[in-house]
Amino acid sequence: MAPPQRCPLCRQTFFCGRGHVYSHKHQRQLKGALERLLPQVEAARRAVRAAQVERYVPEHDRCCWCPCCGCEVRKHLSHGNLTVLHGGLLEHLASPEHKKATNKFWWENKANAQMKEKFLISPQDYARFKKSMVKGLDSYEEKEDEVIKEMAAQIREVEQSRQEVVRSVLEPQAESDPEEGSSAPESWKATNGHVASSSQQVSHLALQPVAELDWMETGQQLTFIGHQDTPGIGNIHSGATPPWMIQEEEHSSGSLPIGPSYEEFLKEKEKQKLKKLPPDRVGANFDHSSNTSAGWLPSFGRVWNNGRRWQSRHQFKTEAATRSKQPRKGKS
């Protein structure tokens, strides 16, 4: 029996030796792993001749899984605020470690030999990518300079328009300042004269006698609306004691108990028990508080009142015999 081996693609242990790599399950898992990596490799190959440089965003930190090396690889190459798209994956595919791991992976898993070149980047292609990356960085810097110049021009235009608005507001005020200075004393005199005349009118009105009102002469009594103190009655606003702080005589004497008595509690408890029983039961209306004597049990039907059972049986037989003899004597 072959020793157990672990397959990383199928994620299981098999005991059939090298025959596992030829199974349909293993070949299906191998094909799926390579198809997941192939679109990303093709996108990286398209970036060899025209490298794209963009501003860094957190999405550029994504990684992809390389089944040949069995590790994660960063897709993009970032430095500071700049990111070269597909730079990390191209650098990994062009490394000698990846080439060695790919040859081993193809040999162990018996993959299609024609597809191996698709997952490798030659040194010539990687050198071409470096040259295009330099050109991409230069073009990106030129675009950034143009954007900065456009923003600076917009800032200058806004500042110039703001200064023109301020100048247009201040010029009319500067022209009207001399005229306002010459007319200031005249306006001051006019205002002073107006204030003096108004003060004289107020003093003249104050000296005139106030006419008495008609309702004062009629002698009608008026109701005072304001703070009224009722003797003996107060509230919390007038400083009186709150009602919950007053000790009443009934409660202070302690003659009245608080809550029901113990007897009432027992009666209520008994009523609650009787409510659970059916209302049409025998003896539902029986008064348990009535007094009964010891001979309350009926004597008919030979009820066993006292003594032994056989005594009552013999007594019943003798009484029945006497009752049967009495009608015979009557007939005779």
From Swiss-Prot:
Q: N6-acetyllysine is carried by which residues?
A: K31
Region called Disordered, residue ranges: 170-201, 311-332
Q: Where is this region: Required for centrosome location?
A: 1-169
InterPro entries from the UniProt entry: CCDC84-like
Arranged from A to Z, the UniProt key words for this protein are: Acetylation, Coiled coil, mRNA processing, mRNA splicing
- Quote the PTM field: Acetylated. Acetylation oscillates throughout the cell cycle, and the acetylation state at Lys-31 is regulated by the deacetylase SIRT1 and the acetyltransferase NAT10. Deacetylated CENATAC is responsible for its centrosome targeting, and acetylated CENATAC promotes SASS6 degradation by enhancing the binding affinity of SASS6 for APC/C E3 ubiquitin-protein ligase complex/FZR1.
Q: Does the keyword Cytoplasm apply?
A: no
Its GO CC terms?
Answer: centrosome
Its GO biological process annotations read: chromosome separation; mRNA splicing, via spliceosome; negative regulation of centrosome duplication; regulation of protein catabolic process
Please list the coiled coil stretches.
137-168
Question: Its biological function?
Answer: Component of the minor spliceosome that promotes splicing of a specific, rare minor intron subtype. Negative regulator of centrosome duplication. Constrains centriole number by modulating the degradation of the centrosome-duplication-associated protein SASS6 in an acetylation-dependent manner. SIRT1 deacetylates CENATAC in G1 phase, allowing for SASS6 accumulation on the centrosome and subsequent procentriole assembly.
Task: Fill in the subunit field for this protein.
Answer: Interacts with SASS6; the interaction increases with CENATAC acetylation.
Please name the PANTHER family in this protein's record: CENTROSOMAL AT-AC SPLICING FACTOR, COILED-COIL DOMAIN-CONTAINING PROTEIN 84
Protein's name according to its UniProt entry: Centrosomal AT-AC splicing factor
Q: Species lineage, top-down? A: Eukaryota, Metazoa, Chordata, Craniata, Vertebrata
Q: Which gene encodes it?
A: Cenatac
